[in-house]
């Protein structure tokens, strides 16, 4: 049986690593050892930040809603409470988008939430 030396396999792995390191600065773009470390770390960052992105966007929607709702004389927490009591099931992403693109429709939703709150 012939001996298998794995040269083709390691070359393919190295090529794949260097492709992933394309655009990196300095040695990390063309030295296998440095590129592998940089690519591994970049994958860790990517995994972490895919999860963080969801939190960041939710916080952004809440900030936008708070600003838009305060113009109508409510706070964010009272607005969300009013929506729950009125039975309006629209998520924060859609509400934030409405506040920016269709202020009159958003105002109608705010009025509905206000009417559901006790005076």
Swiss-Prot record:
Looking up Gene3D superfamilies in the UniProt record yields:
6.10.160.10, Ribosomal protein L20
GO terms in the biological process aspect are:
ribosomal large subunit assembly; translation
> Per UniProt, what is one GO molecular function of this protein?
structural constituent of ribosome
GO CC terms for this protein?
A: ribonucleoprotein complex; ribosome
Q: Which Pfam families match?
A: Ribosomal_L20
Q: Which InterPro entries match?
A: Ribosomal_bL20, RIBOSOMAL_L20_CS, Ribosomal_protein_bL20_C
**Secretion signal span:** none
Name the UniProt key words of this record, in alphabetical order: Ribonucleoprotein, Ribosomal protein, RNA-binding, rRNA-binding
Q: Which domain of life is it from?
A: Bacteria
Give the family from UniProt.
Belongs to the bacterial ribosomal protein bL20 family.
The task this protein performs is described as: Binds directly to 23S ribosomal RNA and is necessary for the in vitro assembly process of the 50S ribosomal subunit. It is not involved in the protein synthesizing functions of that subunit.
Query: How is this protein named in the record?
Result: Large ribosomal subunit protein bL20
Recite the lineage of the species.
Answer: Bacteria, Pseudomonadati, Pseudomonadota, Alphaproteobacteria, Hyphomicrobiales
Q: Which gene encodes it?
A: rplT
């Amino acid at each position: 049986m012939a001996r298998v030396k794995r040269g083709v396999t390691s070359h393919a792995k190295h090529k794949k690593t260097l492709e992933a390191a394309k655009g990196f600065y300095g040695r990390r773009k063309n030295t296998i050892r440095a590129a592998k470390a940089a690519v591994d770390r970049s994958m860790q960052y990517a995994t972490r930040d895919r999860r963080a992105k969801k939190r960041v966007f939710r916080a952004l929607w809440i900030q936008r809603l708070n600003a838009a709702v305060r113009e109508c004389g409510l706070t964010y927490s009272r607005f969300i409470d009013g929506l729950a009591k009125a039975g309006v099931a629209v998520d924060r992403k859609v509400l934030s988008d409405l506040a920016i693109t269709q202020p009159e429709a958003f105002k109608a939703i705010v009025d509905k939430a206000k009417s559901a709150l006790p005076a």
